[in-house]
């Protein structure tokens, strides 16, 4: 994912 306000899963 990404480090920030929102977390996006690595797919």
Curated annotation (Swiss-Prot):
Compartments it resides in: Secreted
Record's keyword annotation contains NADP: no
Major location (coarse): secreted
Valine amide: residues carrying this PTM: 11
Domain of life where this protein originates: Eukaryota
Tissue expression notes: Expressed in abdominal perisympathetic organs and abdominal ganglia.
GO CC terms of this entry: extracellular region
Keywords assigned: Amidation, Neuropeptide, Secreted
A GO biological-process term: neuropeptide signaling pathway
Presence of the UniProt keyword Transmembrane in the record: no
InterPro entries given in the database record: Periviscerokinin
Physiological role: Mediates visceral muscle contractile activity (myotropic activity).
Similarity-based family: Belongs to the periviscerokinin family.
This protein's name: Periviscerokinin-2
Originating organism: Blaberus giganteus
Lineage: Eukaryota, Metazoa, Ecdysozoa, Arthropoda, Hexapoda
